[in-house]
């Protein structure tokens, strides 16, 4: 069963990177429609996620990017995947006419999760040292899933800490 935070091959982020074949600037507005904060990442040419900002519910982030620059979003507190325009990876497209400036609106929404996944992830809000005692009564398979979620949350935290914010004044709307 997928835990919702990883790609099918077990990674928190897809194995994609940016290229620079098209240098036309594209304006994008990411709008968070989730009930929780989300982190917005650009996947750089080295295939590493670069965090551009954290968006609270109903807040937005305006950025300038290019075609062939993939973007993803993750739930801030645990790295669970969310959707950008109903897809796991957003690929910006330039305006149909060269002299037309258009802002692409990208709506970030929750990904559908099973009840089992939601229940397992509910333990992530507890202090990690308390979780083993709280899950003792669960079947062994569910205990392993909760421990897996905790490991992924830790891995996500480490990635976010390593991620270097982009230069310049582009920041989330307050």
UniProtKB/Swiss-Prot annotation:
This is von Hippel-Lindau tumor suppressor homolog. Keywords: Ubl conjugation pathway. The lineage of its organism: Eukaryota, Metazoa, Ecdysozoa, Nematoda, Chromadorea. The keyword Iron does not apply. Pfam families: VHL (PF01847). Involved in the response to variation in environmental oxygen levels by targeting the hypoxia-inducible transcription factor hif-1 for proteasomal degradation when oxygen levels are normal (around 20%). By regulating hif-1 expression, plays a role in iron homeostasis, aging, heat acclimation and progeny size. Mediates resistance to enteropathogenic E.coli. Mediates susceptibility to B.thuringiensis pore-forming toxins. Not involved in P.aeruginosa susceptibility. It comes from Caenorhabditis elegans. One of its GO terms (biological process) is response to hypoxia. One of its GO terms (cellular component) is Cul2-RING ubiquitin ligase complex. Pathway: Protein modification; protein ubiquitination. Disruption phenotype: Increased mortality induced by B.thuringiensis pore-forming toxins Cry21A and Cry21B. Increased mortality and sensitivity to paralysis induced by enteropathogenic E.coli infection. Increased mortality upon heat stress. RNAi-mediated knockdown causes an enhanced resistance to polyglutamine or amyloid-beta-mediated paralysis and an increase in adult life span. InterPro entries: VHL_beta_dom, VHL_beta_dom_sf, VHL_sf, VHL_tumour_suppress_b/a_dom. Belongs to the VHL family. Interacts with hif-1 (hydroxylated on 'Pro-621'); the interaction induces hif-1 degradation. May be a component of the cullin E3 ubiquitin ligase complex. The gene is vhl-1.
């Amino acid at each position: 069963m997928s835990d919702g935070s990883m790609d099918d091959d077990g990674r928190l982020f897809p194995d994609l990177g940016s290229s620079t074949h098209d240098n036309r600037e594209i304006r994008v507005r990411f709008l968070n429609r989730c009930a929780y904060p989300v982190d917005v990442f650009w996947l750089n040419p080295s295939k590493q996620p670069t965090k551009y900002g954290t968006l609270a519910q109903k807040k937005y982030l305006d950025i300038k990017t290019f075609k062939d620059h993939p973007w993803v979003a993750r739930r801030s507190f645990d790295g669970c995947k969310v959707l950008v325009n109903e897809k796991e990876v957003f690929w910006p497209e330039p305006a149909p006419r060269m002299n037309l400036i258009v802002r692409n609106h990208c709506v970030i929404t929750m990904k559908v999760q099973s009840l089992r996944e939601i229940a397992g992830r509910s333990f992530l809000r507890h202090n990690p040292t308390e979780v083993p005692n709280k899950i003792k009564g669960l079947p062994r398979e569910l205990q392993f899933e909760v421990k897996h979620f905790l490991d992924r949350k830790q891995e996500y935290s480490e990635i976010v800490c390593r991620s270097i914010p982009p230069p310049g004044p582009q920041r989330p709307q307050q």
